[in-house]
Amino acid sequence: MSGFLIALFWVIFSKYVFDVLFFREAKIEREIFGNKNLALSLSYAGYFLGLAFSFYSVYFYESLFREVLYLIFVSFTLLLGVYIFDLIFLRKIDLKEEILRGNAGAGITQGIYFLSLGILISASFWRKESFILSVIYSLIYLSLGMVMLFISTLLMSRLLKLNFEEEVKKENFSASLVLGSITLGVSVVLYGAISGEFMGSLIFDLFSTVLYFVVSQVLMVIFYVVVEFLLFRKVILSSEVYENNLSASLILSATFIASAFITLAVMG
């Protein structure tokens, strides 16, 4: 019962924090239900899924004060992580403005990144005797994970010859979906790497995480080449995504996410 009450408080608290930090000028209910803003709905859906995944992995009741403290830390980390990603990788566009004007590509980009970061946070969170120690360990792994998300997105942007920033701004939903699948795939790999058995040393654990990431990127590229040049030789999938062909983006998205699970199988 206490877990349910804590979760209820956390969801309500997180919802209002999200509204204030991201969309304080907008009337959320009117945007979603009155204006039928799909972009904002996608962003919200990803946010709540990210919260739920974090709660599932982080919550372990010890004391009311301690659990509330942990969950507030997770909420702010989730919001801060998405803000930093927007600031660094999508710095040329105002994602909030794009979402409010109904750009579904911007909405799915932010929504999937919320989910990806929720998965990453749940893997990165280390429950130690000291709250401060828990925060430090968690931030080390989370920071490493965010750097890897950025590197992977940059790498695939070059490989596919797609400027994701420009495509999101142009309301290219297909490109946004591919971008989301890349971040989701990497977060799944990192979840498997970080949440595995502790190797007895922080340095060894960090090295193992980097190794997982490198293998995942190699496999992601190999799978892309196989799908692009062997399975679908008569079309250039990346060009189709550029033309906002949703069918092509679904093929590529499935390829990137599948490569993540195969990485876990190979490395496991």
Swiss-Prot record:
Topology term for the membrane: Multi-pass membrane protein
Protein name: UPF0719 transmembrane protein aq_1349
Pfam families: DUF350
Entry keyword set: Cell membrane, Membrane, Transmembrane, Transmembrane helix
Organism: Aquifex aeolicus (strain VF5)
Family under the similarity heading: Belongs to the UPF0719 family.
Membrane-spanning residues: 5-24, 37-59, 69-91, 104-126, 130-152, 173-195, 210-232, 245-267
Assigned GO CC terms: plasma membrane
Domain of life: Bacteria
Compartment(s) of residence: Cell membrane
